[in-house]
């Protein structure tokens, strides 16, 4: 079984050799390594190629080099990697991170018995050279229902990052699950669509990935004020994607992922009033009535989300009027806690 490893490359000169060396040392050897040069202005690609050419470990591995004439974003790099991949499974690595020597072997082991849509491993965070506790994978073994996979995202037992997982290539390509160009938090949206479509997953508790926290990175440098519109765009993009995929998605999974993304949006500046937060969420929701009715098809869900069929002020008044009732209590907690 061939595994295609997709590595976008852009401004990672201090880290790229460590990343490539970790791939070269893999105990699992049926690998296709796709490096996508996103028009990096430094020596990252030069160092990567030299590392490959000088290592005797590269002889039995297949390498593919793709080049962008101009910088297009990590999302486009990953999409090009997906299209170029010929392996049965896909894996993404950020080029400033690195994997354990047995990473692919460990993640591929469960696939000897069943062709899971996703296999996820555990990981460790590194901050300035020190290993710190990450968001550990709170799952173990096989999960065979879409709604259970989605619930693991909602309850933070499964991380949203695309790296450190094997994805069934046919499943990804048949469902046309691609990254949106220049969308912030593209991992969140892509993972949301994957788990709303996947029917099986295997969780491996062993650490197989090392993630590097870099000073000044997108996620470490932004403020709450910058975070809000970006999170809103992710939620809006999720709704837009759902609109196009209704017949193929699990409704329970969609509702769980919606709650997970709402939690990200409501991390707004603290001076936001509850109504302003509610209004932001309503702005994101571009779904048609048909899609909303599909998502809320039980009577309980229809009443729980009835505010979404009303203008924003009336909708807010509706959920406030029901505050404290058993039906609405959980949703208010999701929106405003």
What are the language-model segments listed below?
Residues 52, 157, 176, 243-246, ...:
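Generic secondary-structure transition motif, activating predominantly at the C-termini of alpha-helices
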Residues 140-151, 221-224, 267-273, 294-296, ...:
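General structural signal for secondary-structure boundaries
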Residues 272-337:
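Membrane-interface aromatic/basic loop that binds lipid-linked glycans or pyrophosphate carriers
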Residues 255-266:
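Amphipathic alpha-helical repeat scaffolds of TPR domains
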Residues 1-230, 332-336:
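Nucleotide-sugar donor-binding/catalytic module of glycosyltransferases
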Residues 247-257, 305:
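Structural motif
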Residues 207-215, 221-251, 268-289:
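Catalytic core of nucleotide-sugar-dependent glycosyltransferases
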């Amino acid at each position: 079984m061939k595994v295609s490893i997709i590595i976008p490359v852009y401004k990672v000169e201090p880290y790229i050799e460590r990343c490539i060396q970790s791939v070269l040392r893999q105990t699992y050897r049926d690998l296709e390594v796709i490096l996508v040069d996103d028009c990096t202005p430094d020596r990252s690609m030069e160092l990567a190629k030299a590392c490959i050419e000088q290592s005797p470990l590269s002889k039995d591995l297949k390498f593919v080099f793709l080049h962008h004439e101009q910088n297009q974003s990590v999302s486009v790099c990953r999409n090009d990697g997906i299209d170029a991949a010929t392996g049965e499974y896909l894996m993404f690595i950020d080029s400033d991170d690195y994997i354990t020597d047995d990473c692919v072997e460990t993640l591929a082991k469960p696939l000897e018995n069943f062709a899971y849509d996703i296999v996820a491993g555990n990981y460790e965070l590194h901050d300035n050279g020190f290993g710190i506790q990450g968001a550990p994978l709170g799952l173990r073994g096989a999960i065979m229902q879409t709604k259970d996979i989605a619930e693991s995202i909602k309850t933070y037992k499964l991380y949203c990052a695309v790296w450190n997982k094997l994805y069934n290539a046919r499943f990804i390509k048949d469902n046309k699950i691609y990254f949106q160009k220049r969308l912030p938090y593209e991992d969140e949206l892509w993972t949301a669509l994957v788990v709303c479509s996947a029917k099986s997953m295997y969780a491996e508790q062993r650490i197989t990935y090392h993630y590097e926290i870099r000073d000044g990175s997108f996620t470490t440098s932004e403020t709450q004020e910058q975070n809000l519109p970006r999170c809103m765009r992710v939620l809006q993009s999720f709704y837009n994607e759902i609109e196009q995929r209704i017949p193929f998605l699990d409704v329970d999974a969609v509702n769980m992922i919606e709650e997970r993304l709402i939690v990200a949006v409501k991390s707004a500046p603290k001076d936001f009033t509850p109504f302003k937060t509610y209004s932001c969420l309503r702005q994101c929701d571009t779904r048609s009535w048909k899609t909303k009715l599909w998502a809320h098809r039980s009577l309980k869900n229809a009443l729980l989300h009835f505010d979404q069929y009303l203008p924003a002020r009336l909708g807010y008044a509706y959920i406030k009027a029901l505050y404290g009732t058993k039906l609405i209590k959980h949703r208010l907690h999701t929106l405003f806690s």
